[in-house]
Regions:
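Structural core segment of the AMP-binding/adenylate-forming
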Residues: 2-11, 98, 122-197, 311
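Conserved ATP/PPi-binding loop(s) of AMP-dependent carboxylate-activating enzymes
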Residues: 390-393, 404-441, 479, 574-576
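Conserved AMP-binding/adenylation subdomain of ANL enzymes
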Residues: 240-257, 264-307, 320-324
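Gly/Ser/Thr-rich phosphate-binding loop
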Residues: 196, 305-310, 319-382, 395
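Conserved pre-ATP/AMP-binding loop-to-beta segment of ANL
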Residues: 64-66, 180-181, 186-187, 199-221, ...
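Conserved beta-loop-beta connector loops within the AMP-binding
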Residues: 397-422, 455-459, 522-528, 563
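AMP-binding/adenylate-forming catalytic domain of the ANL superfamily
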Residues: 182, 537-562, 575-585
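AMP-binding/adenylate-forming catalytic core of the ANL superfamily
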Residues: 141-148, 153-159, 301, 308, ...
Length: 585
């Protein structure tokens, strides 16, 4: 099938892109030059995300510029200037110190898109605590796993979420010393405190300690196909990549109105929902509400958004809604739409151009990379369906594994292989928390192996093929089969469970579970609904399966490992491939 091309014409730019000559910028790029554009801590005391994102603006001429504009579910609009954000994050940093939080201690946030989360993140980085955001849609079990594995010392959450999802777990979380409730005016217990009350007593003056660029700053959990969720560790130096990609990919500049729709529990919601926009001194739109097509069009218009960063799932939901921006909806301020989360189909790219007046630019990266690695840029031609070209400073390639386990780069265009990156960019994860061995397996022959299959065409554009493992991408979430299977087999009826992702046009993949039953149970619709509810209660709606199918037995290897690959092939009617290790063969 002939691939389409969207050509960019410079005459159409009312505001010229920050990156106009891709090849020249790549050739002359250096991370040292990027670092030289930032302040660093006074007196050469290092590099700190909180300082670069807020304090260098709060202490200068832009102090009263709007940093955050929060839109509540019920219509309240609250603005926070850089100066106010600086003072509030100082209060939070002082509060952490008062509560005994030390450098490197993990502070978790479970509260959705509320101003307190953004203030807390910045306060953590200033105080040298480690910020660890979680999806508020998680159920008790995923929360407990991540708090335990992350050695959570303090948790920021709402009173409702605490009572429903955290309080029942407290006996299993001995390392959790304090809980701060963002919406409670009174303390619930000695260790369950009202955040507003505590902040009111804290000083709004704080000096950021000396910060090594390699000091741990962020912990993001990402699911694995086996075992527990992996905690990807990122450091303060990551801000260099957030700054560079904010300029070259998101085309951010001071004074822009910017809206990233991602939840902070997802790495996009932290890297590009907090850090990158504030580094560039924009007004960062924070919408508390979930997806609503009319509301989203209204925000784009009323807030005069210049740059919009969203997800393919949301784009496809807008497409399926059938709604088009009304005649009164003014999108003339919008100059760039970027998308990430799963591959963006060509139809969606072209729909953006037809309905919104701009093509949608796909880009690719992972929790482990910490920032955008491959992208379509505002000034470069788009090949709908392609993830684009590597960022300046990033070397990407296609590699294939040899029989001896080593890897070699594939130079020939159009050959499928694993997408790999040369290590060393600033936002690259530094380890998996408590799992250095697993971290080492991600690297071979000076390549970081992404686990994604792709091809590269003759012009250097990369094209996504599929996952090299069993990770399920659903609505932008990374779901590990093992986590879902583990929850299902806690039900007395379930003997075994195998979980796959089934392609679904709107959300990317739908989580489907295959289960076998214990002897005293029989398949029925009633039991199926019971299991769906059971899993949803434990895992939350973001992770729980949407479909369950009963089987008499699951395909397994002779060693007892469930062959999810075979389950998926049978579900999709695809060739089963090598079944030599299948039990009973």
């Amino acid at each position: 099938m002939e691939r389409q091309l969207i050509r960019k014409v410079s005459d159409e730019w009312t505001v010229p892109p920050q990156l106009t000559d891709y090849q020249s910028v790549c050739k002359n790029f250096s991370w040292q030059q990027i670092e030289a554009e930032l302040d660093g801590l006074p007196d050469g005391r290092g590099m700190n995300i909180g300082h670069e994102a807020v304090d260098r603006h709060a202490n200068g001429p832009a102090a009263e510029s709007t940093a955050l504009r929060w839109l509540s579910k019920d219509g309240i609009c609250a603005d926070f200037s850089y100066a106010e954000l600086g003072r509030q994050s100082n209060r939070f940093a002082n509060l952490l110190t008062q509560l005994g939080v030390n450098k490197g201690d993990r502070v978790f946030a479970l509260c959705g898109r509320l101003p307190s989360l953004y203030i807390a993140a910045l306060g953590c980085w200033k105080q040298l605590a480690v910020f660890c955001p979680l999806f508020s849609a998680f159920g008790p079990e995923p929360i407990q796993q991540r708090l335990s594995r992350g050695d959570a010392k303090l948790l920021l959450t709402t009173e409702k979420l605490y009572r429903k999802k955290v309080a029942p777990l407290r006996t299993r979380l001995p390392q959790l010393k304090h809980v701060l409730l963002v919406d409670s005016e009174e303390d619930l217990a000695d260790e369950v405190l009202s955040l507003p009350k505590a902040l009111a007593r804290a000083s709004d003056e704080f000096q950021i300690p000396a910060t090594d660029p390699e000091d741990m700053a962020i912990l993001h959990f990402t699911s694995g196909t086996t075992g527990m969720p992996k905690g990807a560790v990122h450091v303060h130096q990551a801000l260099l990549h957030h700054y560079a990609s904010g300029r070259y990919v998101l085309d951010l500049r001071p004074g822009d109105i910017y809206w990233c729709t991602a939840d902070p529990g997802w790495v996009t919601g932290t890297s590009y929902g907090i850090i990158a926009p504030l580094l560039h001194r924009v007004t960062n739109i924070i919408d508390e509400a979930e997806f609503d097509s009319e509301r989203w069009y209204r925000i784009l218009s009323q807030q005069q958004v210049n740059v919009w960063y969203t997800a393919p799932t949301a784009i496809r939901m807008l497409m399926r809604s059938g709604l088009r921006p009304r005649q009164a909806t003014d999108l003339s301020h919008l100059r760039l739409i970027q998308s990430v989360g799963e591959p963006l189909n060509p139809e969606a790219v072209l729909w953006g151009q037809d309905v919104l007046g701009l093509p949608i630019h796909d880009n690719w990266w992972q929790t482990e990379t910490g920032g955008i690695m491959i992208a379509n840029y505002r000034a470069t031609d788009i090949r709908p369906g392609s993830m684009g070209q590597p960022l300046p400073g990033i070397e990407a390639g296609i590699v294939q594994q040899r029989e001896d386990g080593s890897v070699e780069e594939v130079e020939k265009p159009g050959v499928e292989g694993e997408l790999a990156l040369r290590p060393g960019w600033p936002s690259m994860f530094r380890t998996y928390l408590h799992d250095e061995e697993r971290y080492r397996t991600c690297f071979k022959k000076n390549w970081y192996l992404s686990g994604d299959l792709a091809t590269r065409d003759a012009d250097g554009y990369f094209w996504f093929v599929g996952r090299a493992d069993d990770i399920i991408k659903t609505s932008g979430h990374m779901v590990g089969p093992f986590e879902v299977e583990s929850a299902l087999i806690e039900h007395p009826a379930v003997a075994e469970a195998g979980v796959i992702g089934r392609p679904e046009p709107t959300i990317g993949e739908l989580v489907k579970a295959f289960v076998t039953l214990n002897p005293d149970f029989e398949p029925s619709d009633q039991l199926r609904f019971e299991l769906l509810g059971f899993a949803r209660k434990r895992l939350g709606s973001a992770v729980a399966p949407k479909e369950i199918e009963f089987l008499s037995q699951l395909p397994k290897t002779r060693s007892g490992k469930i062959m999810r690959r075979l389950l998926k092939a049978r579900e999709l009617g695809q060739p089963e491939g090598d079944v030599s290790t299948l039990e009973g063969v």
